[in-house]
């Protein structure tokens, strides 16, 4: 991937999302489905199928917002691809019918959804020791402020297992514009959606870009030169 790929800040990320669901008439369900499928394809093809170990165990950490929704969709597809998946959902979103449907879909795929909040970092570390991949879908680009419980304890525990973590869009706890200001974990892999965010500009791990739902003229509206991003690519993602 060429080095002049655009990285976008929090303001532009929010404006692009607003345009997609306004002018371009996407529903949040559609965007979440495409994003989740993209993440699942990256995890399965680039990490699971390339691993020398068989029967990998995946733990998906879901937050209450859209990033968590992406994680629910990704988990469903990963299960459909034949993987062992378990979801940790400490603040399950039961108010929005969209999330209720996603949860029911995962349950129908016999994916275990664990809602229990553990008090100690060591308790989460024991769980993470028993899996091969941690899919981080706690917080997305709209995250602001300090990391609060119950997520702080989870994120603190993740730092010991950076080589297992694949983050959805941005690593949870990162400031989208300033990066890792709370000195949290740095994941092994990152799947940026729409466009990579400023916080990932110097990311040194395996970096993929997906979420092919942005029309060319929307990129042009924000003066983002993206003509070459998916050149000669028929898949949902590319490696950066």
Regions found by a protein language model. Give the residues of each.
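Generic structural signal for short, flexible, solvent-exposed coil/loop and linker residues
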Residues: 2-5, 9, 15, 20-21, ...
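YjeF_N-associated NAD(P)HX repair module
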Residues: 7-8, 132-240
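Nucleotide and nucleotide-moiety/phosphate-recognizing core
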Residues: 41-138, 146-167
């Amino acid at each position: 991937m060429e080095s002049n790929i655009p990285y976008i800040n929090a303001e532009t990320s929010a404006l692009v999302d607003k345009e997609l669901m306004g002018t371009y008439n996407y529903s949040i369900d559609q965007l979440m489905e495409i994003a989740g499928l993209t993440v699942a394809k990256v995890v399965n093809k680039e990490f699971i199928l390339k691993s020398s170990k068989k029967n990998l165990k995946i733990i998906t950490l879901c937050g209450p917002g859209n990033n968590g929704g992406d994680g629910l969709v990704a988990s469903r597809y990963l299960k459909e691809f034949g993987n062992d998946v378990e979801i940790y959902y400490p603040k399950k979103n039961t108010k929005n019918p969209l999330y209720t449907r996603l949860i029911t879909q995962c349950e129908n795929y016999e994916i275990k959804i664990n809602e229990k909040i553990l008090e100690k970092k060591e308790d989460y570390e024991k769980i993470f020791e028993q899996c091969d991949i941690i899919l981080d879908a706690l917080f997305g680009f709209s995250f602001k402020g300090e990391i609060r419980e119950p997520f702080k304890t989870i994120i603190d525990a993740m730092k010991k297992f950076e080589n297992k973590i694949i983050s959805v869009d941005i690593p949870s706890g990162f400031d989208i514009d300033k990066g890792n200001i709370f000195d949290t974990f740095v994941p092994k892999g990152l799947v940026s959606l729409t466009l990579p965010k400023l916080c990932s500009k110097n990311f040194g791990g395996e970096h993929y870009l997906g979420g092919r739902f942005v029309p060319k003229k929307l990129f042009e509206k924000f003066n983002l030169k993206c003509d070459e991003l998916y050149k000669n690519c028929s898949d949902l993602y590319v490696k950066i």
